[in-house]
Amino acid sequence: MNLKELLNNIEAKIYGKVSPIEVRNLTKDSRNVGFGDIFIANKGKQFDGNDFSPLAIENGAIAIASSIYNPFLSVVQIVSSNLPQLEAELSAKYYNYPSKKLCIVGVTGTNGKTTVSHLIKTLFDGCNKPSGLIGTIEHVLGNNRIQDGYTTPESCLLQKYLAEMVKNRLTSAVMEVSSVGLVLERLAEVDFDVGVLTNITLDHLDFHGSFEEYINAKLKLFSKLPATGLAVVNGDLSYASRFLEMTQAQPITYGIECPADYRAMHLRSSPFGTDFDLVYRGESLPCRLPLIGKHNVYNILAAIAVAHQHCNGDLQQLISLAANVESPRGRLEPVFSGPCPIYIDYAHTPDALENVCKTLHALLPEQGKLIVVFGCGGDRDQSKRQIMAEVVERYGFAVVTSDNPRGEDPEEIIKAICSGFVKRNFSIEIDRKQAITYALSIASDRDIVLVAGKGHETYQIFKHQTIAFDDKEIVREVLSSHV
C-alpha cells in the first residue's frame, strides 16, 4: 500500500506533500526504521518518541505519526491528539483489516487469561479450526512463534501478527486481552467475535488508580462485541451481571457454585488431575481433566463453552480433547514429581497465589508442609504485597525473595511483604537462586515446594540490568547438584 492510499480518509491532520510512495512498515522503534517506514512517535513514561523523529528520518522514514506537529521535520507528518487511536487506524488499514477475516476470541480477567487462551486454542485445533494465539508466553502465528514480552501487543505489532495469521490460513485468533491494552487503545481496530471473562480481583491499581477503573477497563472488551457475538462469563463472579449488561452479544455463563449454562459438579481431585461432571442443558457428562486445581476447572469450562458455541463442536468430542490437554509453561508446572514434588507457577496476584497454594496444600500427605518461594515485582501495585504474605501464611512456610525488583530496592519490597506476616513462619533470602536452594534444602519427602511469581519467564529485571534467570532451570540445577 502506498502512503497516499493509506492516508486517504484517515482522521488526522496531514502536513507536507503526500506522494504515492510505497509504505514498507509501521514501527515505534526508531532503531528499526528503514526506508519506506512510518515512524510512530509515541510519548512514553521514560522516553518521548518525538525526540527520535530526526533519527527515524535519517534512517529512511517517509512519514511521522505524532500527537504534535514539528515544523522542523522534512517528511510528511500525520498528527492526532489521540495517537493510540491513530496508530490503530493506520495499522489496521495498512494490513487490510485482518481481524475481519478471523474469528477473534478475546480473553480478559485478572488471572487465568493465559491458560484459558491456551485451552481454547487446543480445543479449536482439535476441532480442525486452526487458530493463532496472542499472549503472555508467546504469540503463535502459524509455524512462526514470537516472544516479545507483551500480553497485548501495541497496535502496529498486533495488526501485523493478525495479518500473518490470515496469510497462514488460520481461521481464528485467541487473544489475551489485558486491561492496560484496552485503556491504551491497542485493540481499537480489532473486531471481536467472542469475549471471555475469567475473574476480577485486585491488580494493576498502580496503572488504573482504583478497582472501579480496573473493572471499567475490562468492560471495554464486552462493549465492543457485536449482537452476533458471544459473551462468555464466569457466572460465579459477583460482577458477572455488570459484564452481561454491558454487551449486546449472546450471554453464555459457566461456573461451579451457581447455576450456569456450563456447570461443573461433583469435583474429585488427585495429584494427577481433576474429575467432575459437566452439566449442560440438564445432561450430565463425566469429564477428566489432567490438570490440578479448582481454578483449572473454571479454565476448562470457559474453553469448552467457547469451542462448543462457536465451533458448533460436539460436546463429547470436546470432553475427550479436554482429557488430554496440557497446561501452558509455568502454570502449576511440575518440575519434579517424586517425593517432595516441586512446582513453578506464574502466580503474582493474591488471588492466583491463593488458588495454587490451596490446590497444592490439599495434596499434602499427613505431616507434610507447603514451602512457598515468592516475592513481588517492583514498580507495580504495592497494595498487594502485604496480602501476598497473608495468603502464603495460611497455607505453609514462606521463603521471601526477589521477583523482578525493577527500579525499587529489593530489600524494601521484601520489608513491605513481611509486614503482612502475623507469625514468624517465614525466612528471607534476597537472592532468588539462594532462596530456591534454601527451600529445597529444608524440604522433606512429605513436603511440596512451590516457586511462585515468574513461571515461564527466563529473566530477572533489576534497576540497571536484566539477567538470565529461569526458575525451572535453577530448580533442576539445584537438584542435580544434590544427586
UniProtKB/Swiss-Prot annotation:
Subcellular location: Cytoplasm
UniProt key word Cell cycle: yes
Annotated UDP-N-acetyl-alpha-D-muramoyl-L-alanyl-D-glutamate binding sites: 30, 151-152, 178, 186
Catalytic activity: UDP-N-acetyl-alpha-D-muramoyl-L-alanyl-D-glutamate + meso-2,6-diaminopimelate + ATP = UDP-N-acetyl-alpha-D-muramoyl-L-alanyl-gamma-D-glutamyl-meso-2,6-diaminopimelate + ADP + phosphate + H(+)
UniProt keyword rRNA processing, yes or no: no
Pathway(s) the chain acts in: Cell wall biogenesis; peptidoglycan biosynthesis
Chain positions recorded as meso-2,6-diaminopimelate binding sites: 380, 403-406, 453, 457
Binding site for ATP: 109-115
Motif (Meso-diaminopimelate recognition motif): 403-406
Pfam family, one: Mur_ligase_C
SUPFAM superfamilies linked: MurD-like peptide ligases, catalytic domain, MurD-like peptide ligases, peptide-binding domain, MurE/MurF N-terminal domain
Gene Ontology molecular functions: ATP binding; magnesium ion binding; UDP-N-acetylmuramoylalanyl-D-glutamate-2,6-diaminopimelate ligase activity
HAMAP family linked to this entry: MurE (MF_00208)
UniProt record similarity statement: Belongs to the MurCDEF family. MurE subfamily.
Xref: PANTHER family: MUR LIGASE FAMILY MEMBER, UDP-N-ACETYLMURAMOYL-L-ALANYL-D-GLUTAMATE--2,6-DIAMINOPIMELATE LIGASE MURE HOMOLOG, CHLOROPLASTIC
Name of the protein described by the UniProt record: UDP-N-acetylmuramoyl-L-alanyl-D-glutamate--2,6-diaminopimelate ligase
Organism per entry: Chlamydia caviae (strain ATCC VR-813 / DSM 19441 / 03DC25 / GPIC) (Chlamydophila caviae)
Higher taxonomy: Bacteria, Pseudomonadati, Chlamydiota, Chlamydiia, Chlamydiales
